Amino acid sequence: MACTEPSMKRINALTKQLDRIEKKQEKAETAFNKLVEECAHFDNFLRENNTPKPEMQLLRAYLQQYEDERTIIADDIVYSISQINDLKDDIAKGLYDETQREEYLKSEENATKTLEAKLDYFIDRFEKQSEFIKYVEKQ
């Protein structure tokens, strides 16, 4: 079991990272829903004030991009959680040698980094767009 301790530590770290990713997904969903509401209000504001609409096109593009990705992200999170749990069980049963464990762990570490980066990207864009809407409405 001593040879698997580092692997188990990495699995535990991945499990914690996936917990954080799930929270980020909730944050992205909340920000997305809020931005959809703000988008409708902002669109009316721009229409009434004859303001150029490139900002609306950018806002809609971010919303559409997330809409296209959100199910994939959610599915990838569920899949990664399942993979980590299966890997933990398989390592405990001694099913993989060190090379295989390393390969699987690197694959899951890369997958979680990608998920986290996607969610960070969307959260950042949503927050900036929300700030922009508030700024324009105050003008």
Feature roles, as predicted:
Residues 40-80:
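Structured domain cores in non-transmembrane regions
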